[in-house]
Amino acid sequence: MKTDSMEAVHLDYENEEAVKQAQQIGASAWLALASGEANQLNATNALSHLTDLQVRDFALGVIGTATPNIQALISAFIDYSISDKNPDIDAPLHALRAYAYLCEGNTDKADLELKACFSLNSDYSLARLFERTLTAGWETDFYPKMAQELHPKVSDKIFG
């Protein structure tokens, strides 16, 4: 689903119950996509909930801990979804795509995705983090390790 026809979800963080429910919807959609359930509802929920940092970080964990075949499926989904017309959704997608490339060890393509992200949101924090780690010369095997360490914590926060 192209993001130019989609509204990003903006949560009222004072309503903890609504936030948790929205996070569970977004995270569940990423799990469904990773298990091969690519349909309109899952695509919409996965994309529109990326404005929430917990859902975005959950998506990082799904990508970072996925098998290569699932990573390819998610990468194709992200490629298809980016429209560069909705920065609230597309900036996180570019950052997720950069992360997928970093997990593969492809720093050149990751750098291109980070530049695309910055063209939409020059202060996007996750992209800045990846940019700093690339500039510092961190080994790319760090990224999947990061996902393996952080994903259970993010999952517990969303679903616990």
PLM ranges: what are they?
Residues 1-160:
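Charged, compositionally biased boundary regions
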